[in-house]
Every structure is written in structure tokens, then in C-alpha cells.
Amino acid sequence: RNNYRHVVGVSKRFNPNLMKDNKNQSSAGQIAKLPLFHRTPAFMWKPGEEWGNVNFAIWYVRIRERKYTATPYSGILKIEKMLMTGKEAENGLESDEIDMITANIINERNPVCYGNDARWANHLYPVYMTECYCKSRFKSDISFINLF
């Protein structure tokens, strides 16, 4: 379990209606209107036994200017971090840690792969390069079909 202490999950596609505010209303509008390089407040997700009784801190950050993206949610990433210590599980993450994680994610947004992939606005460069490498190792559709 301690191996996940410094692991952060980043989602390029997500359902914005799942994040609720204090009044249990959808935060989708707040997420869509995020200014460039701003983040939402983090919230604690407690999935229960199904997920090993591990809580998560979840927040959203805009990494691309909205006027250059195809949809209101393009250019926004969902960030998740497992809350590993008892203090974190009880109180959540400190804002300073969330800000540091967010700043590091923002720093990984360049260079841009614009035009190479329809999801370009949500790419983090190291992840994009890893995906490209992995895909380059796949057999082409024609080669795969000819195996049968």
C-alpha cells in the first residue's frame, strides 16, 4: 500500500456530473468555466470496501485555453490521489500538496501534439509519447487481419 504514496492518476476523459458541491448539486458548470491553469477545490471520494477502504482526493484543472478547444471540457484533466495515511484519509490532502501536484501536471502539458490526435487538448506530453511508442509496437490492422 505504501508503494502508492506518490502515485497520481490523471484522466483525460471523465463524467463532470459526478463531482457534487456541498449542496449535492453537479459541479459540471464550475468545471467547464475553469480559467486557464486554475483548479477546482479537491473533494474526498470514499468508495468503501469495494476499493479496499481507500479514500481519494479528486480535483480538476484546466491546462488549455478554452477558446482553442472543441468542447467545454477539452483541456481539463481530472486528477486523483489515493489518501494513504490515516491523517490524509481523515482530513484529505493539504492545499499546498494539491497545488504542487497541479503545478507539476501543468508543466507537463507542453510541447503540444496539436493536429496529431483529436484528444490533443487533454494530452500530457510524457503520456502522449508513451502512448505513441506503445501503439507503434502494435501490428497494423491489415497485418492483424491476415493472421487469420
Model-derived regions: residue spans:
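Long, contiguous domain-sized segments
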Residues: 1-148
